[in-house]
């Protein structure tokens, strides 16, 4: 069994993946090169109270996370598999599958750990890549944690805050950007669109919530701010 974390991760997601790998003593496959969100990871690591000693600038995401896994979670080097060339979700899946296929022993089950905002799309991408292949691993989904938002007197906050979470504005930006990609229409990533992922069903209440967020003036302003570009 393998744990496979991917880019766009918050430190809280990294911790979730490393904890499983350490506790279960199973291999940890880390996927991620240098992409459009890498600077967000650099910033998150620099601000982390423990991980800020890790060198980041100019390095692939997977190599940074591998350092965290080894230095802070004491996962042996031989248990860490690094894929450091991918720059997007599709390449994460394709290159990781290729690496798993090189394993001496067949991998029957893999736990996919991703930032919760991208977990659904990542799973749909893996299932699209392997299709009906009977030799493909069984993909298990584990986002590590599920953020919940609430209102206080001043702003929107995380109800269940964890160390290393994205700022709320960054989280909402990622979340609202995922919904159009997950849709199975001409503009989405499903079979009727760009065919990057398997079909994903949308409950009516999710579509309604997305429409509400998409047209919220405060959120639009936040998403257009420099911090979310």
Ranges and model annotations:
Residues 148-211:
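A conserved mid-domain beta-alpha-beta active-site/ligand-binding segment of alpha/beta enzyme cores
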Residues 1-168, 222-229:
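A structural signal for short, hydrophobic/glycine-enriched beta-strand patches
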Residues 203-229:
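Extended hydrophobic packing segments that form well-structured cores
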């Amino acid at each position: 069994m393998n744990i496979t974390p991917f880019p766009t991760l918050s430190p809280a997601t990294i911790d979730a993946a490393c904890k499983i790998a350490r506790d279960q003593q199973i291999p940890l496959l880390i996927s991620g090169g240098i992409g459009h969100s890498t600077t967000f990871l650099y910033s998150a690591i620099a601000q982390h109270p423990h991980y800020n000693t890790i060198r980041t600038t100019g390095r692939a995401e997977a190599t940074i996370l591998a350092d965290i896994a080894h230095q802070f979670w004491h996962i042996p080097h031989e248990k860490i598999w690094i894929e450091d060339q991918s720059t997007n979700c599709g390449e994460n899946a394709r290159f990781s599958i290729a690496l798993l296929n090189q394993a001496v022993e067949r991998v029957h089950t893999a736990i996919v750990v991703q930032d919760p905002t991208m977990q659904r799309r990542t799973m749909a991408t893996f299932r699209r890549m392997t299709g009906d292949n009977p030799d493909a691993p069984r993909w298990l989904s584990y986002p590590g944690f599920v953020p919940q938002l609430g209102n206080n007197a001043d702003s929107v906050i995380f109800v269940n805050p964890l160390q290393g979470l994205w700022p709320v504005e960054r989280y909402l930006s990622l979340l609202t950007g995922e919904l159009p990609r997950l849709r199975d229409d001409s503009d989405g990533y499903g079979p009727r669109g760009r065919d990057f992922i398997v079909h994903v069903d949308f409950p009516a209440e999710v579509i309604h919530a997305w429409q509400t967020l998409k047209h919220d003036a405060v959120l639009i302003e936040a998403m257009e701010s420099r911090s979310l570009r």
